[in-house]
Design a protein with these regions (language model features):
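General beta-strand structural signal in soluble alpha/beta enzymes
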Residues: 52, 116-122, 167-169
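Rossmann-fold NAD(P)-dependent oxidoreductase module
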Residues: 16, 20, 111, 158
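Rossmann-fold NAD(P)-binding glycine/threonine-rich loop
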Residues: 91-134
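Short, conserved loop/helix-junction motifs that constitute active-site signature segments
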Residues: 79-84, 111-112, 135-136
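Active-site-lining helix/loop region of Rossmann-like oxidoreductase modules
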Residues: 128, 141-197
């Protein structure tokens, strides 16, 4: 399992995912379209374990988070080589464009052919994702889906280590339909409370 998490996109979602990975004890390389030099303040705020990188360097990590607006995804990942990396699809297609009956995660999987896509972190707001997942004595719930069991296991461990309670929704199509922006789990913020004795 990779200890390095690459993040493509340094906005609110990218920074929230960086905080989550750091909380889980991972190292983070974060990138944006303007280059590493523009990320000094972001990296300083994230603290130890975080560094700035180019998008291609972030894409070479064992786990890669796509955290850019959906309409910018093709440009953000164009030309990268995908060879077994785990790609976390944290995007949402807010414009609900014509996906021809497919989920946005299926389309992303086509763009990163050779990678193993796991859909997660898109049903919570960036602010909630970045906050302490232990609430009211329980654990914040995060959903994921994907077609590769080992990839889902590695991503589950990342979120478990960060303090979340992970629920696996199954394959990318089934889970993706529930997680996408007009699906039943979009915007749902649940906390798993401990069972009483």
């Amino acid at each position: 399992m990779s200890r390095l998490v690459g993040i493509i996109g340094a906005g609110r979602l990218g920074q929230a995912m960086a905080r989550t990975a750091l909380r889980a004890g991972r190292h983070v390389v974060i990138s944006n379209s303007r280059g590493p030099g523009s990320l000094a303040s972001v990296v300083s705020e994230l603290g130890a374990g975080a560094s700035a990188a180019t998008a291609s360097q972030a894409a070479a990590a064992g786990i890669v988070v796509i955290a850019v607006p959906w309409d910018r995804v093709p440009e953000a990942i164009e030309g990268f080589e995908w060879d077994g990396q785990i790609v976390i699809d944290a995007t949402n297609d807010f414009d609900a464009g014509d996906l021809r009956g497919r989920t946005s995660s299926e389309l992303l999987a086509d763009l990163v052919a050779g990678a193993r896509v796991v859909k997660t972190a898109n049903t919570l707001t960036a602010a909630v994702l970045a906050s302490d997942p232990h609430e009211a004595g329980g654990q914040r719930v995060i959903f994921l889906s994907g077609d590769d069991d080992q990839a889902k296991s590695d991503v589950s461990k990342l979120f478990n280590d960060a303090g979340f309670f992970v629920i696996d929704l199954g394959d990318l199509i089934t889970g993706g339909q529930m997680q996408q922006i007009h699906g039943p789990l979009a915007g749902v913020n649940l906390v798993r409370l401990p069972m009483g004795n």
